């Protein structure tokens, strides 16, 4: 399946280089008991600076001079004059979120109950304080097909109703709708310079309804929400300069109730880039991510990223790339729905900490 914000056969320009304040924050001693060591790569994890909104089609960005020149709006969940770090991509859609007015809603979750709910894969998150009562609220941007909401506890909701996007069962050669968030990393860490890469994330799929009926074809139709890191050779003196690799951490995929325990590698025509997919069971455990529970991933994924590079070398790629040439430059996460599905998920606690080697 096509990854990140790209549609098949379309090469989109690079990400906005805008990771400013909030990135590069090292762990303090006070945080040492609960927070993994290292420098946080995810900037503005609470989305306090909002999101720059993409146009509806990648070629607009490609031909218009980049994301910063072609973004159609900024979604502000709280008042801020700072430029957004996050980008929200709404590719191949009929409905533009630009101009949507924010509204505050009660999301129905009880603060006391929500604190501590998670799946089998990890410990409870901290959605509410102990003893806190009442319902949580969220700021919502929505239109006929999309719903993006940020709760007061930092939980992000991404909802996509593709029954309003597609007027027929999607065919194999047709683009599909995306709704995802992405950012570049400030001071991207090089693989050779870190001894650990601590990944954490909590995920809950609220619903995913297949509207295709008998027209459903699992070869071309699904609703999925992958997480991707970009690994790229940034050494201008290297023959592999500019060569990139998508390293995928699969999450929910409608087609598979049980997570796979094998890696996959394939060539993506649209971005002329290999995609290496980490065995998702190594990240989430042997769980059903679509069961309506919170699930948590928390582990050092550096060995898995190193394995991704090794797998590429086994295929004859990155042969002129030393570990010090390869940097982890950015991420994206969200819905890719190449079929008629109505789906919504929530995400919280996203963190990626690079623990540098101490000389």
Where are the regions that the model predicts?
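Bacterial N-terminal signal peptides that target proteins for export
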Residues: 1-9
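C-terminal motif of bacterial Sec signal peptides marking the signal peptidase cleavage site
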Residues: 20-22
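Bacterial lipoprotein signal-peptidase II cleavage site
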Residues: 24-30
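Extracellular carbohydrate-recognition regions
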Residues: 33-110, 131-143, 359
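Long, intrinsically disordered low-complexity tandem-repeat segments
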Residues: 111-133
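Short N-terminal edge-element motif at the start of the domain
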Residues: 138-212
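Short helix-loop boundary/capping segments
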Residues: 195-197, 202-304
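Long, compositionally biased interface segments
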Residues: 280-359
């Amino acid at each position: 399946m096509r990854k990140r914000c790209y549609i098949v056969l379309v090469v989109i320009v690079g990400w906005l280089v805008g990771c400013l304040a909030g990135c590069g924050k090292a762990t303090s001693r006070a945080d040492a008991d609960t927070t993994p060591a290292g420098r946080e790569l995810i900037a503005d994890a609470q989305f306090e600076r909002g999101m720059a909104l993409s146009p509806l089609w990648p070629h607009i960005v490609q031909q218009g001079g980049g994301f910063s020149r072609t973004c159609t709006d900024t979604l502000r969940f709280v008042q801020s004059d700072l430029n957004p770090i996050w980008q929200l991509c709404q590719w191949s859609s009929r409905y533009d979120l630009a101009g949507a007015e924010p509204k505050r809603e009660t999301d129905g979750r009880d603060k006391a109950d929500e604190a501590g709910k998670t799946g089998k894969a990890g410990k409870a998150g901290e959605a509410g304080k102990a003893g806190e009562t009442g319902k949580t609220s969220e700021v919502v941007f929505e239109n006929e097909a999309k719903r993006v909401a940020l709760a007061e506890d930092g939980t992000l909701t991404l909802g996509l109703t593709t029954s309003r996007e597609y007027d027929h069962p999607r065919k194999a050669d047709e683009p599909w709708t995306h709704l995802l968030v992405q950012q570049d990393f400030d001071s991207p860490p090089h693989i050779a310079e870190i001894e650990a890469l601590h990944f954490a994330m909590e995920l809950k799929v609220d619903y995913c309804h297949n509207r295709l009926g008998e027209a459903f074809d699992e070869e071309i139709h699904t609703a999925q929400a992958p997480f991707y890191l970009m690994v790229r050779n940034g050494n201008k003196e290297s023959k592999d300069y500019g060569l990139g690799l998508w390293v995928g951490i699969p999450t929910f995929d409608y087609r598979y109730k049980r997570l796979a325990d094998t890696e996959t590698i394939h060539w993506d025509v649209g971005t002329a880039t290999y995609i290496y997919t980490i065995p998702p069971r190594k990240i989430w455990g042997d769980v059903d991510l679509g069961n309506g529970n919170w699930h948590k991933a928390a582990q050092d994924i550096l060995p898995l990223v190193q394995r991704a590079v090794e797998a590429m070398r086994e295929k004859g790629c990155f042969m002129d790339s030393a570990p010090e040439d390869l940097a982890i430059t950015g991420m994206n996460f969200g819905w890719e729905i190449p079929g008629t599905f109505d789906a919504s998920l929530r995400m919280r606690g996203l963190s990626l900490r690079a623990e540098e080697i101490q000389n």
